[in-house]
Amino acid sequence: MSKIGKHPVAIPAGVTASVDGQTVKVKGPKGALEVVLVEEIQASLEGGELKIAMRGETPRHKSMWGMSRTLVANLVEGVTKGFEKKLEINGVGYKAAVAGKNLQLSLGYSHDVIYPIPEGIQIAAPKPTELVVTGINKQQVGQVAAEIREFRGPEPYKGKGVKYAGEFIFRKEGKKK
């Protein structure tokens, strides 16, 4: 029995959900999303709740059950609240600015890094050293944040680079004479 998979996903007011074979579609105030579930899993809409069930009892069925339920729950949360990831930029002269549909990053290279903002994602720079990535698709928000962090990940000696807000960077001591 999956601890996560056995719980139904509640559909809040203002959100509509539909199940068409293996496809679960959810529409809400922030937009619409859909996910195609694997063959081992079936979804059903019962009384304002989405229930996820296994089609068999193999270990693969059990492992896909909890994951599929979480994917559907993320759809519902995305179209109601949305998701956000905060990034911090540390380093002398390191900064970020949003220019139209591009993110311009100055990260200590001889050139500025230009990152085109994907469709469905919003990036805000409340301060030159802070970025907020928001959207309704949890996977896409996390992917964009990871791609931005990858341009100049935090280094362990001075802590310079792009890191997630609240992320702990293990610091190393420099060479001793």
From Swiss-Prot:
GO terms for biological process: cytoplasmic translation. The keyword Cytoplasm does not apply. InterPro entries: Ribosomal_uL6-like, Ribosomal_uL6-like_a/b-dom_sf, Ribosomal_uL6_a/b-dom, Ribosomal_uL6_bac-type, Ribosomal_uL6_CS. Pfam families: Ribosomal_L6. GO terms for cellular component: cytosolic large ribosomal subunit. Keywords: Ribonucleoprotein, Ribosomal protein, RNA-binding, rRNA-binding. The keyword Ribonucleoprotein applies. One of its GO terms (molecular function) is structural constituent of ribosome. PANTHER family: 60S/50S RIBOSOMAL PROTEIN L6/L9 (PTHR11655), LARGE RIBOSOMAL SUBUNIT PROTEIN UL6M (PTHR11655:SF14). Belongs to the universal ribosomal protein uL6 family. Part of the 50S ribosomal subunit. This protein binds to the 23S rRNA, and is important in its secondary structure. It is located near the subunit interface in the base of the L7/L12 stalk, and near the tRNA binding site of the peptidyltransferase center. This is Large ribosomal subunit protein uL6. It comes from Azorhizobium caulinodans (strain ATCC 43989 / DSM 5975 / JCM 20966 / LMG 6465 / NBRC 14845 / NCIMB 13405 / ORS 571). The gene is rplF.
